[in-house]
Amino acid sequence: MIYSDKLKELREEKNITQQELSNILKIDNSLFAKHEKEYHIIPINHLNTLCNYFHVSFDYLFNLTDQVNYENALENIDSIKAGTRLKNWRKENKLTQEKLASMLNMARSALANYERGRNIIATPFLYTICTKYKVSADYLLGKIDELVDLK
């Protein structure tokens, strides 16, 4: 599971209902319930809203670290900065677009669009990169500027 256990735990700690969170995200309650159980994957922009609401990092929500949040983390995701970070990270790890796209089981053109900042990387692709290579989601998304050690 990518985030479902942590998300439910955060929601229950704050005594917040699924309905309240669905209102914050401006989505139907039944859709949020499916998101929380990971029947549907939550888009990055909604995860960012939840991370900001609960004052936690993506890395914490993805269970990549026990550190709840990062000092001086930005609230918003800049798609251009995120794309540049992804491209630079890929090159530093000596991966071609073709190789990374193949590993993620996606089209190379979709990866190119992420790297150009046309789209924010999809949640499952981000999670796969972060878990396989132990790289911070918050760093790749441009929310923090320093690489952190992950478990």
Task: State each model region's role.
Residues 1-13, 69-92:
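A short, Lys/Arg-rich alpha-helix, primarily the initiator
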Residues 7, 41-44, 86, 97, ...:
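Short, structured motif recognition centered on aromatic/hydrophobic residues
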Residues 12, 23, 52, 91, ...:
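Alpha-helical residues within the helix-turn-helix
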Residues 15-34, 94-113:
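Short alpha-helical DNA-recognition segment
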Residues 20, 31, 41, 57-60, ...:
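Residues in the helix-turn-helix
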Residues 45-60, 124-139:
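DNA major-groove recognition helix of helix-turn-helix/homeodomain DNA-binding modules
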Residues 60-70, 139-150:
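Short amphipathic recognition helices of helix-turn-helix/homeodomain-type DNA-binding modules
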